[in-house]
Amino acid sequence: MPCPRLLAALFCSSGLFAASGDFCDSSLCLHGGTCLLNEDRTPPFYCLCPEGFTGLLCNETEHGPCFPNPCHNDAECQVTDDSHRGDVFIQYICKCPLGYVGIHCETTCTSPLGMQTGAIADSQISASSMHLGFMGLQRWAPELARLHQTGIVNAWTSGNYDKNPWIQVNLMRKMWVTGVVTQGASRAGSAEYLKTFKVAYSTDGRQFQFIQVAGRSGDKIFIGNVNNSGLKINLFDTPLETQYVRLVPIICHRGCTLRFELLGCELNGCTEPLGLKDNTIPNKQITASSYYKTWGLSAFSWFPYYARLDNQGKFNAWTAQTNSASEWLQIDLGSQKRVTGIITQGARDFGHIQYVAAYRVAYGDDGVTWTEYKDPGASESKIFPGNMDNNSHKKNIFETPFQARFVRIQPVAWHNRITLRVELLGC
């Protein structure tokens, strides 16, 4: 077959293709491009180029807002117009994979938000109804709907005559919510659980909208559990920026009985534990104004470095020597970090419940000069609400995060003795 004229003729004369005229025999396409025949046209072939390359032979680097891909974690970069985005990153958006958020999908966002640990308080959980069992003495109340809750009455169950049941959580501020983990329970010896459910959300607690099916109209129906004890994880196609999350049972096995956890992260995306619980921060970097010895015995000391969230053992927290507002616990982060929040926890001393009920936070870079945290526009340092028992987590997020190496916690109110286990959040 004679060579086509012009460009194809150049390839002919250069001997880059077989005598039979099959232009794809010589693998003309560069950078892993795929050669496809384009018979009866000029040129008689074309190259299907991999991402990032263009040109007749995939010999040119593709340019544009998505090349190279600015998105992280294998997110898809989508070219758009300036009117689609209101921020400085014009011409593209990043479509995040499940469990990631951020302008560039840079933040992993699947942390438990506090149902299981108690960081979400009982008062933040409400429902359309609840079941009253055993002559009204058993309250299957919404505040029991915590993942892995134990006991004879250990979950939320809707009322017998509730035709449109729901349970909701008020997160107290806008957060990213990326998924939910559900679990059933056993009631009167029988397994009960949600087989399917919907998820609604709201920013004001009054007007709710349901998560929709991706790419189609209609409310999304999530698949729930198949027994009373197993866990079912559902991640949302699109993260929710919301304050209220409502689970609406659709099909229930025997009764609408639920334990659950919400997954997500703070909007600022900088809420990773800074190293107290996992011992990344060494003992020598955790100090205090004093520490208590039960019965005055050194063997029964409540050292500062015991003040790690969820620490276990007979002596598993820091306790101050005196109940005085002059006492403090100090953490040296080792280098300057962005600190966005704190989680506190109390402990027991031979059966006596002890915790810090309120405290201030101070910070600095040299361990000598301190700045007490204040809310924006406030003239007085902020007093943070602390714990109400010895074991639950209490999370406080700083409205204005700060940069610091040293963080000091200053108790101002306590129950029995000043006792703390703690984790700092940030990045």
From Swiss-Prot:
One of its GO terms (biological process) is single fertilization. GO terms for cellular component: acrosomal membrane; extracellular region. A motif (Cell attachment site) lies at residues 85-87. Milk and spermatozoan. Also present in epididymis, kidney, heart, lymphatic gland and spleen but not esophagus, small intestine, muscle and liver. Disulfide bonds join C24-C35, C29-C47, C49-C58, C66-C77, C71-C94, C96-C105, C109-C265, C252-C256, C270-C427. It is found in: Membrane; Secreted; Cytoplasmic vesicle, Secretory vesicle, Acrosome membrane. InterPro entries: EGF-like_dom (IPR000742), FA58C (IPR000421), Galactose-bd-like_sf (IPR008979), Neuropilin_MCO_CoagFactor (IPR050633). Its main location: membrane. Residues 109-265, 270-427 form the F5/8 type C domain. Residues 20-59, 62-106 form the EGF-like domain. The two O-linked glycans consist of Gal, GlcNAc and Fuc, with probably Fuc as reducing terminal sugar. Keywords: Angiogenesis, Cell adhesion, Cytoplasmic vesicle, Disulfide bond, EGF-like domain, Fertilization, Glycoprotein, Membrane, Repeat, Secreted, Signal. It is a peripheral membrane protein. Glycans are attached at S27, T34, N59, N227. Residues 1-18 form the signal peptide. It holds the Pfam family F5_F8_type_C. Contributes to phagocytic removal of apoptotic cells in many tissues. Plays an important role in the maintenance of intestinal epithelial homeostasis and the promotion of mucosal healing. Promotes VEGF-dependent neovascularization. Specific ligand for the alpha-v/beta-3 and alpha-v/beta-5 receptors. Also binds to phosphatidylserine-enriched cell surfaces in a receptor-independent manner. Zona pellucida-binding protein which may play a role in gamete interaction. The F5/8 type C 2 domain mediates high-affinity binding to phosphatidylserine-containing membranes. PANTHER family: F5/8 TYPE C DOMAIN-CONTAINING PROTEIN (PTHR46806), MILK FAT GLOBULE EGF AND FACTOR V_VIII DOMAIN CONTAINING (PTHR46806:SF11). This is Lactadherin. The lineage of its organism: Eukaryota, Metazoa, Chordata, Craniata, Vertebrata. The gene is MFGE8.
